[in-house]
Amino acid sequence: MDFSQGLTPARLIRRYKRFLADVEIEDGTIITVYCPNTGTMRTCSTPNSPVMLSISDNPKRKYAHTLEMIFENHTWIGVNTGRTNSIVAKAILNGSIAEFSGATKVQREITVSKGSRLDLLVDHADQKSYIEIKNCSMAENRRAMFPDAVTARGTKHLRELIKLVKQGENAYIFFLIQREDADSFSPATHIDPLYANTLKEALQQGVQALAYQASVILRALPIILNGSNSPHLPQR
C-alpha cells in the first residue's frame, strides 16, 4: 500500500456506529476518525491497540483521518476495506498472483446482472476471469476467516459467480488476508452458516477460490473446508 503523505500513529479508544472510531494521537488529543469497514472487526478492534491513520486534504470531509491499520496479536492488520480491490488489482498486474499471470487488463466494478456487480474482470492468457474480492481481517488460532458478520450481499455475490460458471465463464472468489498471523483460511461457519454453505456449493459448481495475504511478498494460503486442506470439497 502506498501512503504518499505518511501515516499518523495513534491509540484506539473505541470503534462505534460501524464507520467511526475515537483514537488518541501522540500529543494526547482524542479525535474521531473515519473507519471504512462494514464488518464487526472481530479480533481487530481491541481498545488501547496501536493504530495507524491516513489523512485527507479534502475540505469537504467531516473527518480528516481514516483508520488504516491496527496492531493486534503481534501483527499489523489492514482494516480499510476501501483499499482491498486496489491491492488485488495491482498485485495481478505486477504478476504477484500466479493464477492470473500474463494479465494485460483489469476492469473494475463489472455489471453482471441487473443490480449486481462484481469487483474485477481480468484479461489474462487469452481468457477472461471474473473476480469477487473479500477483505479478511479476522483470524483465530492462526486461521483467517470470513465473514466476521452475516453477509447477505456476500452470499448474493457467490450466486452470481455460480451463474457465470454455468454460462461457461471463469469465476473466482478472492479472499485478501490483511494480516500475517494466519497460515490458512476457512469460511466462518459459526458466524454465517449460509455463506459458508453457499461457498461450498460454489466450489462444487466450479467457482475457484483463492486466499492471499497482503504482505511484502504475497503467498497463497490453503483453504480449509470440512477439515480438508484442498480448495475443493472432498468427495462424498
Swiss-Prot record:
<comment type="similarity">
    <text>Belongs to the SfsA family.</text>
</comment>
<dbReference type="InterPro" id="IPR040452">
    <property type="entry name" value="SfsA_C"/>
</dbReference>
<dbReference type="InterPro" id="IPR041465">
    <property type="entry name" value="SfsA_N"/>
</dbReference>
<dbReference type="Pfam" id="PF17746">
    <property type="entry name" value="SfsA_N"/>
</dbReference>
<dbReference type="InterPro" id="IPR005224">
    <property type="entry name" value="SfsA"/>
</dbReference>
<protein>
    <recommendedName>
        <fullName>Sugar fermentation stimulation protein homolog</fullName>
    </recommendedName>
</protein>
<dbReference type="GO" id="GO:0003677">
    <property type="term" value="F:DNA binding"/>
</dbReference>
<dbReference type="Pfam" id="PF03749">
    <property type="entry name" value="SfsA"/>
</dbReference>
